[in-house]
Amino acid sequence: MNHARDTIAAVATAQGRGGVGIVRVSGPLSGQLAQAICRRELKPRFAHHGPFYGEQELPLDEGLAIYFPGPNSFTGEDVLELQGHGGPVVLDLLLRRCLELGARLARPGEFSERAFLNDKLDLAQAEAIADLIEASSEQAARNALRSLQGEFSKRVHALTESLIQLRIYVEAAIDFPEEEIDFLADGHVLSQLDGVRADLSTVLREAGQGALLRDGMTVVIAGRPNAGKSSLLNALAGREAAIVTDIAGTTRDVLREHIHIDGMPLHVVDTAGLRDTDDQVERIGVERALKAIGEADRVLLVVDSTAPEAADPFALWPEFLEQRPDPARVTLIRNKADLSGEAVTLQTSADGHVTLSLSAKSADGLELLREHLKACMGYQQTAESGFSARRRHLEALHQAEQYLEHGRNQLTLMGAGELLAEDLRMAQQALGEITGAFSSDDLLGRIFSSFCIGK
């Protein structure tokens, strides 16, 4: 559908000086603005070189003008692009001329919002535009481009279609009880439901990797006092971010460093040494450390390799801890290899435990750790397999997963087809929030307001 509305204008290029600057216009007055500024009729989708005029035929600049009649444009509306010189004064003069002729200044993200409202792209694709602009690594940029091209949306639509087909079957059985379809006896519903859950789990895992590449991975360095945690933080940061002494308990609070590995963002957190203590200040530091561990994407459990310790990371956590992190997101760091004489190695056991021997002091093995962290973020994905995702996408996928699990329990434990049908509907609605099929105005406002002006 085409949303007839006022005409908007904005500078579409980054602030500052450059060789080229672009003013973008969208809305029903775009054609009139083109005629007034260029003083001639523009052939659609052709680049026209010439002066850009202000009042009283006073030239403001010269460059290329391109007119895109709707609906075959980015926003689905009539669009005008004026590509002139990239000086801020010149661009401001050109933008002010557009406003004098009836346009208004666009809000941040309003061009992309109109493209979404006019069905030119869905919400996940619109967000991918911002992700592509803000990408901090080559792989993050590739993933954002694939999302912009619809790869993530395609996966979500496939899940939604499977849910719709399952809902049709379940609701038909409920509406026509004379058919006497036994949900459990024929096995069709459970089989289809488990298939959707498996597909959803795959998409959720890949979306999680995409979110890490976009937002960065939170890595928490944990362990007992004097294991070398702060030395490891300093080695990764490349500077003296934390105080290092031989006194146990030097670090009493969490320290955060934001670093990049080959352009990939990492949020590294150093924590207080984990031990049962009567010192009130140190106990607060331990509590904050445990909170950080629970929120981490990856935990580096640092142990002193010169001390006789067990090799199982789960057994290495202090006995007083009531809850310990999932071993699947823990890397055991056997530090001080320069003192113990251990070889610098990265090993993965049969049960999936990852152990890395290194020396934070000498930096031996540090490159192995960097490569390992990159792999945890999905750096080794092929260009054909990744897509960009955001935290809100993960929340929606998790919601859908919970609804499907709840619906399965309702069916298998109670034989409640009506309750299953409602859970299927809610799961479909959760998926729809990703692409914008089900989205409140408040959600749309928050998303598009985070965009650049002119996008």
From Swiss-Prot:
One of its GO terms (biological process) is tRNA methylation. GTP binds at residues 226-231, 245-251, 270-273, 335-338. K(+) binds at residues 226, 245, 247, 250. It is found in: Cytoplasm. GO terms for cellular component: cytosol. Exhibits a very high intrinsic GTPase hydrolysis rate. Involved in the addition of a carboxymethylaminomethyl (cmnm) group at the wobble position (U34) of certain tRNAs, forming tRNA-cmnm(5)s(2)U34. Homodimer. Heterotetramer of two MnmE and two MnmG subunits. This is tRNA modification GTPase MnmE.
